[in-house]
Design a protein with these regions (language model features):
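Short glycine-rich phosphate-binding loop at a beta-alpha junction
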Residues: 49-59, 83, 191-193, 293-299, ...
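N-terminal small/polar loop signature for handling phosphorylated ligands or for N-terminal nucleophile
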Residues: 41, 53-119, 170, 207-266
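Active-site nucleophile and cofactor-binding loops and adjacent substrate-binding regions
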Residues: 82-91, 272-275, 297, 319-322
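Gly/Ser/Thr-enriched, mixed-charge loops and adjacent short helices
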Residues: 118-245
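Glycine-rich phosphate-binding loop
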Residues: 105-117, 245-267, 272, 318-319, ...
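An N-terminal, well-structured beta->alpha segment
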Residues: 1-71, 77-78, 154-189
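Phosphate-binding and adjacent anionic-ligand microenvironments
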Residues: 290-399
Length: 399
């Protein structure tokens, strides 16, 4: 079994179902079974312990259920205590290693991010965060050994991770907005529209925004549908959500990718806040509490953004090589060297904050944006004012 061909940087990716001409299935049940057992071997070596707890979740892809069954079987055959979280976001799966209600040793997310419906993949987490490229190579080596001995004491329990994760986000909003009149409903009077792209992000409407008093009318594509019938599940596909914000006269729009590790925003005028603008907005939020911090971005950011960061926000801007893990790892490295870096972000919408485990979490970024929008709303201002001095290039072309 050639598992190496399934590695895509720090992820596993492959064709999971037939349906696209010329694309045969590569991410088989046998492959994910072996990868699951390889992950167990990786964790046992790292933590030097036999008894492990591992959480598993998935996005809305049509192949998720079948793959999950094979992965769970691999974990159970290794004697693992499995926590089946069902529909989840990629960042919430890491948080299953953090939350007191879970305290997992590791987590597996079944997702292929924004790729077409016939693709799927796996992301792996331990208590330190997402596994990197070299970790995946080690995991694959373990998985290819195929000399596994089945154990008898594995088990499976089902738990609602998204509800715990949503409560975490709600408490953050209540605390940071600190509404003087309606503390428990800090988003009262605000109209916030969400486009979940038929991925896993619909929970943000009914589990986060609505309980806090937000009017979410006009929100679209909230139902999980792994065929992605409305638009590609990518926060860079902005036209539909921009139109919806204008039509519904919303104060703010939020769009997620399939597994909610990326997000972008729309201001009240229907203007997209994506690519260079989402970097600028995230930096503006961070620099209020951390003046002069270093913002690490991918290399394709514009000169206009660089000027905004350094000469308007007065933070340091470091362009680094592309790839969200590269950008995050560089920010982590800077902090270890004593250089404060609070934000690592790609123009694609991958944003990781130091205050949040350097986890690239689209819902956490959206939450920070919602908090600031709510505070500005109380003061009679709007979010677009934060980046009004950002100039845009006359033409953007990626080579």
């Amino acid at each position: 079994m050639e598992l190496k061909k399934l590695q895509n940087g720090s992820d596993i990716r492959g064709v999971a179902v037939d349906g696209v001409e010329g694309e045969s299935v590569t991410l088989t049940k046998e492959a994910v079974y072996a990868l699951a057992r390889g992950f167990v071997a990786y964790l046992r070596k790292k933590y030097e312990k036999e008894e492990l707890r591992i959480a598993i979740g998935h996005d809305s892809r049509i192949s998720a259920k079948e793959l999950k069954e094979s992965i769970i079987q691999g974990l159970v055959d290794e004697g693992v205590q499995v926590c089946d979280c069902g529909l989840a976001s990629t960042p919430s799966m890491f948080m299953s290693t953090v939350f007191e209600e879970f305290k997992e040793d590791g987590a597996i997310m079944i997702t292929a991010s924004h790729l077409p419906y016939n693709r799927n993949g796996m992301k792996f987490f331990d208590k330190d965060g997402g596994l990197n490229k070299e970790d995946i190579k080690t995991l694959i080596t373990f998985g290819e050994q195929e000399s596994f001995i089945n154990k008898e004491n594995g088990s499976v329990e089902t738990k609602d991770l998204l509800s715990v994760y949503s409560a975490f986000l709600r408490e953050l909003i209540k605390k940071e907005v600190n509404h003087p009149n309606t503390y428990d409903k800090p988003l009262s009077g605000m109209k916030i529209l969400v486009d979940a792209g038929n991925g896993a992000g619909g929970f943000y409407v009914d589990k986060v925004l609505q309980p806090l008093g937000a009017d979410t009318s006009g929100s679209q594509f909230l139902e999980p549908d792994g065929m992605f019938p409305n638009h590609i599940p990518n926060p860079e596909a902005m036209q539909s959500v921009c139109d919806a914000v204008k039509t519904n006269h919303s104060d703010l729009g939020i769009i997620f990718d399939t597994d909610v590790d990326r997000s972008s925003a729309v201001d009240k005028y229907g203007h997209e806040i994506s690519r260079n603008a989402i970097v600028a907005l995230a930096a503006a939020l961070v620099c209020e509490q951390h003046p002069g911090t270093t913002i690490v971005t991918d290399s394709v950011t514009s000169d206009e953004l660089h000027d905004f960061l350094e000469n308007v926000l007065h933070v340091k801007h470091l362009r680094f090589k592309r790839g969200y893990k590269n950008v995050i790892n560089e920010a982590v490295r800077l902090n270890k060297e004593g250089i404060d870096s609070q934000l690592a972000i790609e123009t694609s919408g991958h944003a990781a904050l130091k205050e949040n485990y350097f986890l690239d979490d689209g819902a956490y970024l959206a939450t920070k944006i919602v908090i600031k929008a709510a505070k500005m709303h109380l003061e009679g201002h709007s979010l677009d004012e934060l980046i009004k001095d950002l100039k845009h290039p006359l033409e953007e072309k990626e080579l």
